[in-house]
Regions:
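Non-catalytic, solvent-exposed segments at the cell envelope interface
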Residues: 2-12, 16-219
Length: 219
């Protein structure tokens, strides 16, 4: 599922770039018409700069933004996926981080406490979550993308839904934890809207693999 979300995110970036690009092109045309009278164009060779080093992006899903969670609490990063893009091998590798891993979290005041990995975001936002993961795994994270539950719903709806394959053999729902939520995802290939995609990515208690199964659905 994260692959679809990455695609959505890149799509939003592309739309923004195209909009800015169209405006910039208009200004460029006006400028070149004026400058053409004052200088002579010289030959230039266009060079394409290609990335050579891997790029690591942290995707974080934060458990805020739901209709039942409107308090000012920052939330936990209950979903964390490392995405590494390697231009040399031309491969993209995705790895989920277990949210319940016990680790050392250095607090903003300099003290250190042992807590679950997902609590780092609640303690100090994206900056502390990133630094905690970097220290724990001895890696460097270049960029991050953070989305809450409402953000996920809006992204999915904005692209007209996403198609998933429910291979669990039974409908997916979270009504046992949230009785008001009556959404159920049928077995097999399904096209989901934002509300349904949120349920699909959150359910874990009914999954035989628990949180590991949920991580697979998120990826």
């Amino acid at each position: 599922m994260a692959k679809k979300i990455i695609g959505m995110f890149l799509g939003f970036v592309l739309v923004t770039v195209l909009g800015v690009g169209a405006y910039a092109y208009t200004i460029y045309q006006q400028s070149t018409q004026t400058l053409a009278k004052t200088y002579k164009q010289i030959g230039e060779e266009t060079k394409v700069i290609e990335a050579t080093e891997p790029l690591t992006i942290l995707l974080m899903g934060v458990d805020t933004g739901n209709v039942e969670r409107t308090d000012p609490w920052a939330g936990n990063s209950d979903s964390m996926i490392l995405v590494t893009v390697n231009p040399k091998t031309k491969k993209v590798v995705m790895m989920s981080l277990e949210r319940d891993i016990l680790t050392q979290i250095q607090q903003p005041d300099g003290s250190v406490r042992e807590a679950k990995l997902n609590a780092a975001y609640a303690d100090g936002g994206a900056e502390l979550a990133i630094s905690t993961i970097q220290k724990m795994m001895n890696i460097h994270i270049d960029r991050y993308v953070m989305v809450n539950m409402h953000g996920l719903q809006r992204m999915v709806d904005a692209v007209g839904g996403i198609t998933v394959n429910n291979t669990l053999g039974f409908p997916i729902s979270i009504q046992d934890q949230e009785p008001f939520n009556t959404i159920s995802i049928g077995v097999g290939e399904q096209t989901l809207n934002g509300d349904e995609a949120l349920v699909y990515s959150r359910m874990r208690y009914q999954d035989p693999e628990g949180d590991y199964g949920r991580q697979k659905r998120q990826r």
